């Protein structure tokens, strides 16, 4: 076991929500000195009172331990159940952008992956990775020019789609260049997307690109 003691843990947030469709829970996340997020999932059982369903019976601490990248447990896929973020571990702790697996825990302590996203906290958006891509070699290439960031998702080295974060005076005209389509407009930023020629082969089109793109809301609200 990791022998964590309370004093080494900095409690980041607590979130209330459902762990199964009929079981409310409190998700309390602490971050340890190695930048791992440790989440206790507390439910109330008539016979036992408060129970931590994420508890590892052997180590006596939570088994819900994932790299911390400033993301909170949340219902990422809209199914009414809270998922825990599990960012890809190979990025540095300061790096807030990257792929995230979202794990849903059951009240009996079982868990499974229920979503995958590319989260771009630096620009305030995320993209839901289609289920059919989960077993493929998907990577992200990020490039930046003046007033424009581009994130390209590639499968087996093929560029499938790009998402652009565009600022500056001529952002509207740049959001419509070539085959780009406008995804969202904010006060000073336009988010645009583009699907490339190979996209249909991987089941991606402009409609799915639109539906898979979301702005991150209330990220900074540490409730």
Where are these regions (language model features)?
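Conserved blade-ending motifs and adjacent loop-strand segments that build the rim/top face
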Residues: 53-74
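Beta-propeller fold detector
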Residues: 7-8, 52-59, 113-118
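Surface-exposed amphipathic alpha-helical segments
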Residues: 133, 193-223
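Single conserved hydrophobic/aromatic residue that forms the stacking wall/gate
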Residues: 1-6, 10-13
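Structural motif
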Residues: 2, 34-48, 91-107
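Secretory pathway targeting signatures of secreted, lumenal, and periplasmic proteins
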Residues: 130-183
């Amino acid at each position: 076991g990791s022998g964590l003691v309370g004093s080494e843990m900095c409690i980041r947030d607590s979130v209330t929500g459902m762990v199964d469709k009929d079981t409310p829970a409190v998700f309390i996340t602490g971050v340890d000195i190695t930048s791992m997020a440790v989440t206790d999932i507390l439910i109330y059982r008539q016979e036992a009172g408060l129970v931590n369903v994420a508890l590892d019976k052997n180590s006596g601490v939570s088994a819900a331990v994932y790299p911390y990248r400033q993301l909170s447990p949340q219902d990422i896929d809209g199914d009414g159940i809270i998922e825990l973020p599990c960012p890809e571990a190979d990025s540095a702790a300061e790096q807030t952008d990257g792929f995230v697996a979202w794990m849903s825990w059951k009240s009996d302590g079982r868990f499974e992956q229920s979503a995958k996203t590319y989260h771009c906290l630096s620009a305030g958006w995320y993209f839901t990775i289609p289920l059919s891509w989960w077993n493929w070699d998907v990577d992200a290439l990020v490039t930046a020019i003046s007033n424009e960031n581009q994130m390209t998702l590639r499968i087996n080295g093929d560029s499938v789609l790009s998402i652009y974060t565009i600022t500056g005076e001529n952002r509207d005209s740049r959001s419509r260049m070539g085959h780009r389509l406008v995804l969202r407009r904010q006060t000073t930023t336009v988010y645009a997307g583009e699907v490339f020629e190979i996209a249909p082969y991987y089941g991606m089109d402009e409609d799915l690109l639109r539906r898979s793109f979301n702005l991150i809301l209330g990220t900074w609200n540490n409730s």
